[in-house]
């Protein structure tokens, strides 16, 4: 009889068993295309059992056979697997398995033995992956939208590194565009103001108060010499860029975010990377001179003048329009610079790239994917993760800011208000492309309304039980059938899902799934704690019953382990005591 095997990765083991049974029943090796579509996972509803698979649907399509008939054959084969209590078939061909309690008892023992390696599946096998995130223009401190992207990129990088990828965290510094000229002009006005002149911050300049300390530092270093200096622009540019990048690095450090590589647009220009990239694409026949149609939304002829220009064949790769690489004055477009930057990434050996962008760049995704495909002959991939805006509230009331007056909440403001760990966790409590409501009052509450508090409280409770427990029986001697109540089994089933959560979060580049999961674990543990508060028989530490106490405390150890592993991916320290 085939066994479900170790419960360290229960769903991974069942996947292997399903693949084995498919091969035995229908012969031949299971193809990669079939494997890619095969799902073996926990069902969304308890009534569908403990494990479900779409194998019959996938094989039915592949073999052109009735999936219900295939499901019945698969049901009979899986019913023979040790640890499987029952197998059901549900139209149009899903197969649902229910495991025996012995599987859950074994899980407690196996997970305790695995310790901190529990869930660390080696998906990446050392493969290089480049995660570019934040990449905010160096014109001011990080606002809260940047902070959301920073936390997302950092947590995703942690997750990918934990599952075996060689991760490079990269920041692209746009230090060669028109916004830098605007920065220089804005700083110069503040410089004159620091020297005692009356100035007016004109429309289109940066009005923020954060420029005043930079201007003051310029005065301390140069006095009034820059007023008449021919090198004024270059001096201010270098000084302002360094000052603001230092400010950005400090803000990211407050959030617990650090990059491995900073790549500068100006350096790529100096090394003529754009020209090399254009030549490369021309040799591949990916560029041509042509005329674009009038963009949608531009109705008047006077607002649009058709002209022949250098275009990238973006539509060959699924984009809705070919894209211009050169402006009328002969300079390169922003998109040309972006193509060149990804040309540089690929030349550095990155064929697996992830890019975090603000949601307002949604229309940019298809052209960027087209460029990466063209540059690599389809060998490189880029996953663009869009992060949506953050709405700030105070007890449900929106916090009003004015961009016109240079008023906005910075990453520093938020960390100083609620702390790094709280800020990081809240940023992960919604899928990255969904608008996030951040309520300062709720964030600081010590209640279930503060999700990170709720999780930390569960961990602290678990640690308290472990500290106060008597010496436990050796784990090999423990009878885990003593943790057989419905809430205990429900908690174990949830804890067994951890490797599956890790894998799905990593494969889909969606680390918010871990936040959702940790909340489920915390809730299930608090429910079990509540049963113990109401019934002596359900307490974790049972006076005079070391056998039951040992079984329950080993379960508590798994709760603490899983919460600490999840929080470590978020770079949040688990709390052993609540103060």
Swiss-Prot record:
One of its GO terms (molecular function) is ATP binding. It comes from the Bacteria. InterPro entries: aa-tRNA-synth_I_CS, Arg-tRNA-ligase, Arg-tRNA-synth_N, Arg-tRNA-synth_N_sf, ArgRS_core, DALR_anticod-bd, Rossmann-like_a/b/a_fold, tRNAsynth_Ia_anticodon-bd. It holds the Pfam family DALR_1. Keywords: Aminoacyl-tRNA synthetase, ATP-binding, Cytoplasm, Ligase, Nucleotide-binding, Protein biosynthesis. One of its GO terms (biological process) is arginyl-tRNA aminoacylation. GO terms for cellular component: cytoplasm. Its main location: cytoplasm. A motif ('HIGH' region) lies at residues 136-146. SUPFAM superfamilies: Anticodon-binding domain of a subclass of class I aminoacyl-tRNA synthetases, Arginyl-tRNA synthetase (ArgRS), N-terminal 'additional' domain, Nucleotidylyl transferase. This is Arginine--tRNA ligase. It comes from Anaplasma marginale (strain St. Maries).
């Amino acid at each position: 009889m085939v066994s479900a095997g170790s419960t360290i990765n229960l769903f991974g083991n069942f996947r292997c068993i399903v693949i084995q049974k498919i091969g035995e029943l229908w012969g031949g090796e299971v193809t990669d295309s079939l494997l890619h579509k095969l799902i073996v996972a926990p069902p969304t509803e308890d009534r569908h059992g403990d494990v479900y698979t779409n194998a019959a649907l996938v094989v039915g399509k592949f073999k052109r056979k009735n999936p219900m008939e295939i499901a019945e054959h698969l049901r009979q084969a899986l019913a023979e697997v040790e640890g499987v209590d029952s197998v059901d078939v549900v139209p149009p061909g899903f197969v649902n398995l229910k495991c025996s309690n012995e599987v859950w008892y074994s899980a407690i023992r196996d997970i305790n033995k695995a310790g901190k390696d529990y869930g660390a599946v080696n998906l990446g096998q050392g493969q290089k992956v480049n995660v570019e995130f934040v990449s905010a223009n160096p014109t001011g401190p990080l606002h809260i939208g940047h902070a959301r992207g920073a936390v997302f990129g950092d947590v995703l990088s942690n997750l990918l590194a934990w599952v075996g990828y060689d991760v490079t965290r990269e920041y692209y510094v746009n230090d060669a565009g028109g916004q830098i000229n605007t920065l220089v002009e804005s700083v110069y006005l503040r410089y004159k103001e620091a020297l005692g002149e009356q100035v007016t911050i004109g429309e289109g300049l940066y009005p923020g108060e954060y420029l005043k300390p930079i201007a003051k530092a310029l005065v301390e270093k140069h006095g009034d010499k820059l007023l008449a200096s021919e090198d004024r622009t270059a001096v201010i540019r270098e000084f302002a860029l360094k000052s603001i990048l230092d400010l950005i690095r400090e803000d990211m450090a407050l959030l617990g975010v650090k990059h491995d590589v900073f790549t500068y647009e100006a350096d790529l220009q100096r090394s003529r990377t754009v020209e090399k990239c254009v030549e490369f694409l021309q040799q591949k026949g990916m560029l041509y001179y042509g005329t674009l149609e009038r963009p949608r939304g531009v109705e008047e002829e006077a607002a649009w003048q058709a002209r022949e220009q250098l275009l990238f064949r973006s539509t060959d790769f699924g984009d809705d329009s070919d894209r211009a690489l050169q402006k009328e004055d002969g300079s390169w477009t922003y998109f040309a610079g972006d193509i060149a930057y990804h040309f540089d990434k690929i030349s550095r050996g990155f064929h697996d790239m992830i890019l975090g962008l603000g949601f307002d760049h949604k229309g940019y995704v298809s052209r960027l994917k087209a460029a990466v495909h063209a540059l690599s002959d389809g060998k490189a991939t880029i996953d663009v993760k869009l992060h949506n805006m953050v709405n700030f509230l105070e007890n449900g009331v929106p916090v009003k800011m004015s961009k016109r007056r240079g008023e906005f909440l910075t990453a520093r403001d938020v960390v100083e208000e609620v702390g790094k760990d709280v800020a990081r966790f809240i940023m992960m409590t919604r899928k990255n492309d969904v608008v996030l409501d951040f309520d300062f009052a709720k964030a600081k509450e010590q209640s279930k309304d503060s999700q990170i508090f709720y999780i930390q409280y569960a961990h602290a409770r678990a640690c308290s039980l472990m500290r106060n427990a008597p010496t436990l029986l050796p784990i090999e001697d423990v009878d885990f059938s003593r943790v057989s109540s419905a809430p205990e089994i429900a908690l174990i089933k949830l804890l067994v899902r951890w490797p599956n959560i890790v894998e799905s979060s990593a494969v889909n580049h969606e680390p918010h799934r871990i936040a959702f999961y940790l909340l489920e674990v915390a809730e299930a543990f608090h429910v079990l704690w509540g049963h113990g508060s109401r019934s002596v028989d359900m307490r974790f530490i049972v006076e005079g019953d070391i056998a039951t106490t040992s079984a329950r405390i080993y379960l508590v150890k798994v709760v603490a382990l899983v919460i600490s592993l999840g929080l470590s991916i978020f770079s949040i320290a688990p709390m052993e005591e609540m103060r």
